[in-house]
Design a protein with these regions (language model features):
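Short, conserved beta-turn/loop elements at beta-strand boundaries and strand-helix junctions
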Residues: 63-68, 114
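Short, cysteine/histidine-rich loop/knuckle motifs that typically chelate Zn2+
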Residues: 26-29, 40-46
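Short, basic/aromatic beta-hairpin or loop at an interaction surface
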Residues: 76-92
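Residues immediately within or flanking Cys/His clusters that coordinate Zn2+
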Residues: 21-24, 38
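A broadly conserved sequence feature marking short terminus-proximal activation segments
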Residues: 1-22, 115-120, 126
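Conserved hydrophobic positions within beta-strands
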Residues: 58-61, 97
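Well-ordered alpha/beta subsegment
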Residues: 90-126
Length: 126
């Protein structure tokens, strides 16, 4: 899998993953949390959100099983599952899930270190 394009807006997310932490944004005004990263709160419009580490555990909201690779680099990994996961600390993340996956399953984060970046994956909670 190829490395993501990391810019100044997404760097705190990727830095958190490199440290094996899931980081969401939290509004300084309404205190709601969200992902993906945005420059202002999607709920009240306030700017300058805080970065907040969360456990990363959550519940599968939806998922899809890919039987065709999105790129040649992933051709030997099909089939694989990508899920929308509602995080316990707030926010929703899209990530690969290893093993069994079903709507409503509790999942826990796993961090896969590559040469220059860290990938967030999930597996079913024991």
């Amino acid at each position: 899998m190829g490395a993501p394009a990391i810019d100044r807006d997404s760097a705190p997310w990727w830095d958190g993953l490199r440290a094996h932490r899931v980081v969401v944004q939290e509004c300084r005004v309404c205190t709601r949390r969200w992902l993906p990263r945005t420059p202002a709160c999607p709920y009240c419009g306030a700017g300058t959100p805080n970065d907040q580490p969360v456990s990363g555990t959550g519940v599968v909201y939806s998922f899809v099983r890919a039987h065709r690779a999105m790129s040649d680099a992933m051709a030997d990994e099909v089939p694989y599952t990508i899920a929308a996961i509602d995080l316990d600390g707030g926010g929703r993340v899209f990530a690969r899930v290893e093993g069994d996956c079903a709507i409503g399953h509790r999942v826990a984060p796993e961090f896969v270190d590559h040469d220059t970046w860290t990938e967030l994956r999930y597996s079913e909670c024991p």
